């Protein structure tokens, strides 16, 4: 499996930034997940609760700044 260009984590929120090469240069996309425990195992979910929103906003701002700094376009 491909590795993300960058992974940011704040609390239980994780954002992965994926880089893809194109003729116009690098292009980025991202995924957002929330970690939770299912018994003894940590699992990821794309469902977010109301109280997750402030952390998601913070990490998305950091991801956006990283993408701007590292060039490239959004997918």
What are these regions (language model features)?
Residues 1-75:
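Single-stranded nucleic acid-binding surfaces, predominantly the OB-fold ssDNA-binding core
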């Amino acid at each position: 499996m491909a590795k993300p260009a960058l992974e940011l984590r704040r609390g239980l929120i994780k954002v992965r930034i994926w880089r893809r090469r194109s003729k116009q240069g690098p292009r980025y996309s991202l995924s957002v997940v929330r970690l939770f425990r299912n018994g003894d195992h940590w699992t990821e979910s794309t469902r977010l609760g109301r109280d997750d929103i402030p952390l998601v906003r913070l990490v998305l701002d950091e991801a956006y700044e990283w993408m701007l700094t590292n060039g490239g376009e959004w997918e």
